[in-house]
Amino acid sequence: MVIEIKIYYHFLLGETMSYFWTVCVPCYNPDERLEKLLDSVVAQNCKDDIEVVIIDDCSTKDYSNILDKFKDKLNIFKYETKLNGGPGPTRQRGIEHSTGEWITFIDQDDVFLPDVFKDVKKQIEEYPTIQTLVNTPFYIVDAVTNQITQYLPNADNWIHGKFYHRENFLLKYNIHFCEDLYSHEDIYFSTLVKGVLNCNKLPYIQCNTPTYNWYTYADSLSHKETETGLNYLEEYFGEYIDSILEPVMQLDEQYKNKDFTAKQLLTLLLFGYFYIQGFLYYNSTNFKRDNITKFRQLLDYTEDCLGLTNDEIIQWTYNNPKDYFDIREKAAGGTGPMIETYSYASFINEVKPQVKNNDS
């Protein structure tokens, strides 16, 4: 999907500047919550270090009145897409139009915590040779009660609370958002990040200071996956598989690192198995059979790529019981508690019966 962009709205304080940070904000019909986000950027008290790149994804209402309030406080660059593409392609346009040395992504209805950029910059200056990624914890917060509902110290499949070196990491290694995914775009991007770090043995900085409040709202597109849970996951199960499978295929072709490839594919098979068990447990009557087909395609690729039989794939789970139960617990976070209709072994063999040679 190709999305054309034009410069639509632009504030710039003073002459052309070189920025340390780019804050990329995908926007669609934002309201006063965008103002709260921008207030949290102003409160960092380092405006000369920061550019705010707003990528508007075909909003149907004008919100220039919100941006006007910040024309003397922030360096804001606004671009407008020609085609509504969702958060993935919109964030990709943000990378392409950013100029900061480091880039971070934030949703239009979330906020940064105080002194984030100063604290993270100190970490970067302590390790000047590490120009890849700064990973930080963040909070999930109920927007109605303003109570923290979850603390995520190391959410590696999320882009939130992370700061990426634009030139020496994202651009150098072609880490990008997929143009064709409407959902799970952050998993696709994060899989590329993990693969590049792992396959090139690159270090990154782990910062222990929380940087970000991720708010849950009933009307937020970016949070509907959490809101609708099981139904969302079942509807977009194919895109979930593709969001990991496609970057793993790219990385396998480029790096030939079978240890990384095997770990990702075998883990993805387990997640797929548990998700399907959840679908069957909660909605067996209207279960989408296409999701079995998608799982079979993943199983076919895993066997072809790694040269493994069904029995060898199943044996991996027996050899890694901690991974098995950790993945089951994480999967239950999306589907809810479940009773497995089939064991992993019987499910694998039913999806793709193992052909056995009989000696005559």
PLM feature spans:
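Membrane-interface aromatic/basic loop that binds lipid-linked glycans or pyrophosphate carriers
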Residues: 12-13, 17, 279-360
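Short, well-formed alpha-helical segments that are part of the catalytic scaffolds
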Residues: 30-43
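Short beta-strand/loop segment that forms part of the nucleotide-sugar
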Residues: 49-58, 78-83
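Glycine-rich, basic loop-to-helix element that forms the pyrophosphate-binding segment
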Residues: 82-98
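Conserved nucleotide-sugar donor-binding catalytic segment
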Residues: 151-229
